[in-house]
């Protein structure tokens, strides 16, 4: 469960960071 969650976060967080900071 945790490795899956970590993988999901690693894929999801950069997209949020990109939207917030406008840096992609």
UniProtKB/Swiss-Prot annotation:
Keywords: Antibiotic, Antimicrobial, Secreted. GO terms for cellular component: extracellular region. Its main location: secreted. It comes from the Eukaryota. InterPro entries: Antimicrobial_frog_1. GO terms for biological process: defense response to Gram-negative bacterium; defense response to Gram-positive bacterium; killing of cells of another organism. Expressed by the skin glands. Pfam families: Antimicrobial_1 (PF08018). It is found in: Secreted. Antimicrobial peptide active against the Gram-positive bacterium S.aureus (MIC=12.5 uM) and against the Gram-negative bacteria E.coli (MIC=25 uM). Belongs to the frog skin active peptide (FSAP) family. Brevinin subfamily. This is Brevinin-1GRa.
């Amino acid at each position: 469960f945790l490795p899956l969650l970590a993988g999901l976060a690693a894929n999801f967080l950069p997209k949020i960071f990109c939207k917030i900071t406008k840096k992609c």
